């Protein structure tokens, strides 16, 4: 969907990108992050060995909406500590 919308809207100088977040320390994910059993299973699958902080997701979004990404459209940015690498 991201790529389709990016192609359709690019002529209007509208950029469409997606953020693909990894496990992030939020209230929404607390049932996962506060479970020692789950964290014991999940952390080894993340090459960086930790979960993300919300501000790390915010930084990625700030990049995507900034002028530094003015020629970026149709991108799916993985911010997952290398989990999908």
List PLM regions with ranges.
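Hydrophobic alpha-helix immediately C-terminal to the catalytic Tyr-X-X-X-Lys motif of short-chain
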Residues: 1-5, 9, 19, 64
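C-terminal helical subdomain
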Residues: 18, 40-68, 72, 81
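Short, small/polar-rich loop/turn modules that mediate ligand/substrate recognition or access, typified
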Residues: 10-15, 72-74
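A short hydrophobic alpha-helix cap/turn motif
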Residues: 9-11, 24, 52, 65
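Short, glycine/acidic-enriched loop or turn micro-motifs at the edges of active sites
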Residues: 25, 81-83
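Short, flexible catalytic-loop segment of classical short-chain dehydrogenase/reductase
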Residues: 20-31
């Amino acid at each position: 969907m991201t790529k389709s919308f990016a192609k359709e809207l690019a002529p209007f100088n509208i950029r469409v990108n997606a953020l693909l977040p990894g496990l992030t320390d939020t209230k929404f994910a607390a049932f996962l992050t506060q479970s020692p059993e789950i964290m014991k299973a999940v952390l080894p699958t993340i090459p960086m060995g930790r979960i993300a902080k919300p501000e790390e997701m915010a930084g990625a979004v700030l990049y995507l909406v900034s002028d530094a990404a003015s020629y970026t459209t149709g991108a799916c940015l993985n911010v997952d500590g290398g989990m999908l690498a």
